[in-house]
Structure formats: structure tokens, C-alpha cells
From Swiss-Prot:
Protein residues bound to Mn(2+): 151, 153, 232
Binding site for 1-deoxy-D-xylulose 5-phosphate: 126, 152-153, 187, 210, 223, 228-229, 232
Residue positions binding NADPH: 10-13, 38, 125, 127, 216
Alphabetized NCBIfam families for the sequence: Dxr, PRK05447.1-1
Protein name, entry field: 1-deoxy-D-xylulose 5-phosphate reductoisomerase
Source species: Blochmanniella pennsylvanica (strain BPEN)
InterPro entries: DXP_reductoisomerase, DXP_reductoisomerase_C, DXP_reductoisomerase_N, DXPR_C, DXPR_C_sf, NAD(P)-bd_dom_sf
Functional summary from the UniProt entry: Catalyzes the NADPH-dependent rearrangement and reduction of 1-deoxy-D-xylulose-5-phosphate (DXP) to 2-C-methyl-D-erythritol 4-phosphate (MEP).
MF terms in GO: 1-deoxy-D-xylulose-5-phosphate reductoisomerase activity; manganese ion binding; NADPH binding
Known cofactor(s): Mg(2+); Mn(2+)
Reaction(s) the record says it catalyses: 2-C-methyl-D-erythritol 4-phosphate + NADP(+) = 1-deoxy-D-xylulose 5-phosphate + NADPH + H(+)
Gene of this entry: dxr
Length: 397
């Protein structure tokens, strides 16, 4: 049996991971659950899964969790708190694989801890690659960590890669593997056909609905602005060592075809699956083998003639274009982009700014800050903090 630490267990990816584990209790068990401050869900998960450790980033949340577990009779679960303990649980010798699903820059340190311990990392945290992709892929090679992407698009590309590319992720050029380009699909978000003039009136409640996927509030807004796809573009650049000319983004509202790989010999491999995150999670957990999975629906071959594809108009999605521009600029620019976006989205969710203000805030922060590329995690966090401070000052004016 293989043991897991789940970073971000109370979020949508964490819940989906636990769902896969519950279908395969003969193959996997939970060593530790880690979350920020959602005590209610963490309590339920601890009672259901009986991990050896439960860690809350918030000390106050950890105290409440401990009381809840004592009340529930779960005396054998050790409750910890803080980022340091999260890092320890991600790197301990008692763990075979780590699900990195903490949303935002908060997932950076625990994920790097797992990396430096040579773990099998199921990478769902976009920000690790967006903010530290160069450093992360370099150290993945150094510590021989196995990186398996969880985002449906990157997971789909990974499945369509030749074994040599899978085994040397980020180090082998696509052209050397006979690949001419990779294609990521994008649903276009909930406001795909909404006239531009109406976007200023969009509410957080409207933006937090995704047409195909079940996701958290922040990621749902990122999907609506298409920043999510911009971040995925940056991820793909690092994960697959791809040049800008080797990546294409294609609008596909149904989210059935997740990615395509074009080979130089004329072959095109497309990956199709229902929009259910348990599918890429199960693939990554079992890799290089495969395991069965009970899902509510499967692909109906007769439905395929109803699928739609279209070119992406970057002008309609300013957040996406900002991500492309930042990636073309520098690693520090993508750190600033990510930090400014997190603050802008939070401000929108709190109704401090409008939906269409989000790209304006990001653009102003990018224009205001110019720092050297990071050499280590502390540099990343410094640049991130400076960008957040600037974004906050803009949002509260």
C-alpha cells in the first residue's frame, strides 16, 4: 500500500483525491491531511479517513480541530499547526506521494519540501510552477522527484507523451521527442458569450459558477477571466520545456477534449474524458499503472459530433494576455502577475472592485514593479510580498 500526504485536503482537489482513495482502500491510505483553516471539513475528513496526522496552517484552527476530534473520540490523530509542520509532513520518510493542492503561493514551501525529499508529487498547485518553475524543474531533476501534473490539460498532455518525455519531464525538448506542438483546450469560462459591456456588472456569485467543473471560488474567478488558462500556459512552458511557438490554446466549451499533441510525423493524439478531476488524480496516483474508477458518466461516442472548437481571441481576455506577456518577460514578472491576481480576485470577491477591474489592477502592479529573477524560495516570497503590497494599495484606493 502507498501512503499520501494531502496538502489542501479541504479544497475541491483534496476532496476528489479522498474520493479516489475511498474507492481503493486496498492500495492507498492517508498519512496526513493539511489545510489552512476549514475546521468543519477537516473534522469530517479526519473522522472518515483516520490519518495519523492532521495539520492546520492556522494555530487557532488547529486548536478547534483538536477539540472536535477529542469530542468525536479520535484520540489517535495528532493535530499539528503551521507551515513548518506542513513541510515536515510533505517530506517525511513515511510518505510515498504528496498531493500538492493548496491554492496560491501558500503551497510553495510544502511542495518544495516534498520535491527535495524526492517524493512522487501530484502537482495541482499552479503557483509552484508559475512563481518558481525554473527553480522547481531544476531541483526536480537534482532530487529525482517524480512530478505528475494534475490539471486536466497537463495531465492529458502527459498521457500523450512518449515515455522518454514522461521520464525526463522538463529536461527533454519537445522537438527531440518528435512533437511539433501541444494544444491546451479552454472552456472560455462562464462568460464565454457575454457581451463586453455587460462584464462590468458581473457579481462574485455569477463569476463563481463554472459551466463544466466543480471548483473553488478563486479558481472559478480565474476561469471566468481566463487567467486560469494563462497560468496553465506558464505551467506547460516549464513542465514540458515548451517554446511559446510549441503551445496553442484552443477554445472548447464542452471540456471533453482536454489536450492534443501534434507529432512531426503527422499523428495527432487527443485526450478525451468527462470533466471529473478524479480521472487525472487516479491516473497520477497509480502511475505508471492504471486503476479502475467509478464515475457518474463516461464519453458517449455519438456526442462527439456536437463538440465545438474555436480560436482564442486574446483581446477578449486581457488577463490571459497579461499572463503571456509576463511569461515572455521574466520569472519575476510571473511572480508579480500571480500575486497581483490573487489580491485582485480577493478584492473582487469582497466587492471592493469590479470584475473588469481585475486585469487593470494586475497591469498596474506589473508596470510598477521591476525586480531581478529569484534564485531561491526566499527571493520568490520577497517578490510576491512586494507585488501584494502594491496590489492592496491599488485595490483600497
Amino acid at each position: 500500500m502507498q501512503s499520501l500526504t494531502i496538502l489542501g485536503s479541504t479544497g475541491s482537489i483534496g476532496k476528489a483525491t479522498l474520493s479516489v482513495i475511498q474507492q481503493h482502500t486496498d492500495k492507498f491510505f492517508v498519512h496526513a491531511l493539511v489545510a489552512k483553516n476549514n475546521v468543519a471539513i477537516m473534522t469530517e475528513q479526519c473522522i472518515a479517513m483516520s490519518p495519523k496526522y492532521a495539520c492546520m496552517i492556522s494555530e487557532d484552527a488547529a486548536r478547534i480541530l483538536k477539540k472536535n476530534l477529542i469530542t468525536a473520540g479520535k484520540y489517535d490523530i495528532e493535530v499539528l499547526s503551521g507551515v513548518m509542520h506542513a513541510c515536515e509532513l510533505a517530506s517525511t520518510n513515511d510518505v510515498d506521494m504528496v498531493m500538492s493542492a493548496i491554492v496560491g503561493i501558500a503551497g510553495l514551501k510544502p511542495t518544495f519540501s516534498a520535491l527535495r525529499a524526492g517524493k512522487k508529487i501530484l502537482l495541482a498547485n499552479k503557483e509552484t510552477l508559475v512563481t518558481g518553475g525554473k527553480l522547481f524543474m531544476k531541483e526536480a531533476n537534482r532530487y529525482r522527484a517524480c512530478i505528475l501534473p494534475i490539471d486536466s490539460e497537463h495531465n492529458a498532455i502527459f498521457q500523450n507523451l512518449p515515455e522518454i518525455c514522461q521520464k525526463s519531464l522538463g529536461n527533454t525538448s519537445l522537438s527531440e521527442c518528435g512533437i511539433s506542438r501541444i494544444v491546451l483546450t479552454a472552456s472560455g469560462g462562464i462568460f464565454f458569450k457575454t457581451p463586453q459591456k455587460q462584464l462590468t456588472k458581473i457579481t462574485p456569485e455569477q463569476a463563481c459558477v463554472h459551466p463544466n467543473w466543480s471548483m473553488g471560488r478563486k479558481i472559478s474567478v480565474d476561469s471566468a477571466t481566463m487567467m486560469n488558462k494563462g497560468l496553465e500556459y506558464i505551467e506547460a512552458r516549464h513542465l514540458f520545456n515548451a517554446k511559446p511557438s510549441e503551445i496553442e490554446i484552443l477554445l472548447h466549451p464542452q471540456s471533453i477534449v482536454h489536450a492534443m499533441v501534434y507529432y512531426s510525423d503527422g499523428n495527432v493524439l487527443a485526450h478525451l474524458a468527462p470533466p471529473d478531476m478524479r480521472i487525472p488524480i487516479a491516473y497520477a496516483m497509480a502511475y505508471p499503472k492504471r486503476i479502475g474508477l467509478k464515475i457518474s458518466s463516461n464519453i458517449d461516442i455519438y456526442y462527439l459530433n456536437k463538440l465545438h472548437f474555436d480560436q482564442l481571441d486574446n483581446c477578449s481576455y486581457p488577463c490571459f494576455q497579461l499572463a503571456i506577456d509576463a511569461d515572455n518577460c521574466s520569472q519575476s514578472a510571473t511572480i508579480i502577475l500571480n500575486a497581483a491576481n490573487e489580491i485582485a480576485v480577493e478584492a473582487f470577491l469582497r466587492k471592493m472592485i469590479s470584475f473588469t477591474d481585475i486585469p487593470d489592477v494586475i497591469r498596474r502592479v506589473l508596470d510598477a514593479i521591476n525586480l531581478n529573477d529569484p534564485n531561491d524560495i526566499e527571493d520568490i516570497l520577497y517578490i510576491d510580498q512586494k507585488a501584494r503590497e502594491k496590489a492592496i494599495s491599488i485595490c483600497v484606493i
